[in-house]
């Protein structure tokens, strides 16, 4: 009888999440972290970094759509987009669905993530790495953000959790450089974990955003493999204009974009900014 193999994630104290591994496709250590890709009966192919689930074939659409379409459609005229992280290509996939976006810069610290994602998780990028509008830069996102002189309409920080190489993407210094790199009406969105489990992540980001941006808040999306309730996606902008866009305008922009997402709708977009009390209490 074959012994069952499980991948167990222990990101949070006093709590673990296990996914059954029906087939292991990839298991190797890069310079920065241990990467695995395996098959799970519920979620399809699963990508983990140091055993922590990063994305899955089954539920990635929720995270990638909400981190992308919310800022781009709220902005309404985004032409230049910066992605920090996102080596699996899922964010790039969604950004490049917007024909109005002319140039995408994607900064990924680990070339190994990109290479094996192309080979083992092609369903995530769906050819995004071959799009002529995408400029892939292998560099530390914090270093790039400090040194860039370019301006961006939307900055999407698709980071890992604030441990290891992803830690610098949660600092006040990084956010300060990002604020400088935004256009006048630009928007930054960030991955800030699950507030019920990782409240400090949201508190620290909101403290930094409140000092840097006229509009600083978060919005929510529930992704099954990011356990503990809704995930917080940070939102910062030098203007309140984007977040106050009415539903009719969003619906018109959505229709013009010709999108057919599986999670995002203009109604979900507006509702995502309605925050429960326990999340509001995490704001400084």
From Swiss-Prot:
PROSITE patterns found in the cross-reference section: PABS_1, PABS_2
Pathway(s) of this molecule: Amine and polyamine biosynthesis; spermidine biosynthesis; spermidine from putrescine: step 1/1
Catalytic activity, as annotated: S-adenosyl 3-(methylsulfanyl)propylamine + putrescine = S-methyl-5'-thioadenosine + spermidine + H(+)
Enzyme class: transferase
Active site: 158 (proton acceptor)
EC number: 2.5.1.16
PABS domain: residues covered: 4-238
Binding positions (S-methyl-5'-thioadenosine): 33, 108, 140-141, 165
Its biological purpose: Catalyzes the irreversible transfer of a propylamine group from the amino donor S-adenosylmethioninamine (decarboxy-AdoMet) to putrescine (1,4-diaminobutane) to yield spermidine.
PANTHER family per record: SPERMIDINE SYNTHASE, SPERMIDINE/SPERMINE SYNTHASE
Subunit note: Homodimer or homotetramer.
The protein's name: Polyamine aminopropyltransferase
